[in-house]
């Protein structure tokens, strides 16, 4: 088992519902530590840059519009197999398919407004963390 870091974003829909603490509590109860966190209002350029891999997909414009519609919480989670653990906690991308008790089943509205983002691989985690955080902003715990 590897100690890993992953990026988590609490998306505008979940921030608007005021469930930030409930979501973060789930991370901590699962053994993940929050080692960096900040609230941001993403600009269009920031959202487009972060989701650049989806630029040619038909949903790109809607995704960027949604991610800039309100503040988000970006955070780095650390722990044993953090990437897989976070993805298990989040549940399926489509909340209608998400298992009961997952973040998306409990807090998401739709496949677009699905409450949270999490890195899907070690390579994505490294790139996504570096997109939002400098090394000096990540605190060992």
UniProtKB/Swiss-Prot annotation:
According to its UniProt record, which residues of this chain constitute the active site?
117
Return the PROSITE patterns for the record: NDPK, NDPK_LIKE
Q: Which residues bind ATP?
A: 11, 59, 87, 93, 104, 114
* Annotated GO MF terms: ATP binding; metal ion binding; nucleoside diphosphate kinase activity
Looking at the UniProt record for this protein, which Gene Ontology cellular component terms does it annotate, in alphabetical order? cytoplasm
Q: Which InterPro entries match?
A: NDK-like_dom (IPR034907), NDK-like_dom_sf (IPR036850), Nucleoside_diP_kinase (IPR001564), Nucleoside_diP_kinase_AS (IPR023005)
Q: What is the first-listed, main subcellular location in coarse terms?
A: cytoplasm
Give the catalytic activity: a 2'-deoxyribonucleoside 5'-diphosphate + ATP = a 2'-deoxyribonucleoside 5'-triphosphate + ADP; a ribonucleoside 5'-diphosphate + ATP = a ribonucleoside 5'-triphosphate + ADP
Q: Does the keyword NADP apply?
A: no
Any Pfam family hit: NDK
- Name its co-factor(s): Mg(2+)
GO-annotated biological processes:
CTP biosynthetic process; GTP biosynthetic process; UTP biosynthetic process
Subcellular location(s): the record lists: Cytoplasm
Print the keywords alphabetically.
ATP-binding, Cytoplasm, Kinase, Magnesium, Metal-binding, Nucleotide metabolism, Nucleotide-binding, Phosphoprotein, Transferase
Q: What class of enzyme is it?
A: transferase
Matching Gene3D superfamilies? Nucleoside diphosphate kinase-like domain
This entry's Enzyme Commission designation comes to 2.7.4.6
Question: PANTHER family, from UniProt?
Answer: NUCLEOSIDE DIPHOSPHATE KINASE, NUCLEOSIDE DIPHOSPHATE KINASE DDB_G0292928-RELATED
> What NCBIfam families would the database entry show?
PRK00668.1
Q: What role does it play? A: Major role in the synthesis of nucleoside triphosphates other than ATP. The ATP gamma phosphate is transferred to the NDP beta phosphate via a ping-pong mechanism, using a phosphorylated active-site intermediate.
Q: Which family is this protein grouped under?
A: Belongs to the NDK family.
Q: What is this protein called?
A: Nucleoside diphosphate kinase
Q: Species name for this entry?
A: Chromohalobacter salexigens (strain ATCC BAA-138 / DSM 3043 / CIP 106854 / NCIMB 13768 / 1H11)
């Amino acid at each position: 088992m590897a100690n890993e870091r992953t990026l988590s974003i609490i998306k505008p829909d979940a921030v608007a519902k005021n469930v930030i603490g409930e979501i973060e509590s789930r991370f901590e109860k699962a053994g993940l530590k929050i080692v960096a966190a900040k609230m941001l209002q993403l600009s269009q350029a920031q959202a487009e840059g972060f989701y650049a891999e989806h630029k040619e997909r038909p949903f790109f414009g809607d995704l960027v519009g949604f991610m800039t519609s309100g503040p988000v919480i970006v955070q780095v989670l650390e722990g044993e197999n953090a990437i897989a653990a976070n993805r298990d906690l989040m549940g399926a991308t489509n909340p209608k398919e998400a298992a009961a008790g997952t973040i998306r089943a409990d807090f998401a509205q739709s496949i677009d407004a699905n409450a949270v983002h999490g890195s899907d691989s070690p390579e994505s985690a490294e790139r996504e963390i570096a997109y939002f955080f400098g090394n000096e902003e990540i605190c060992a715990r």
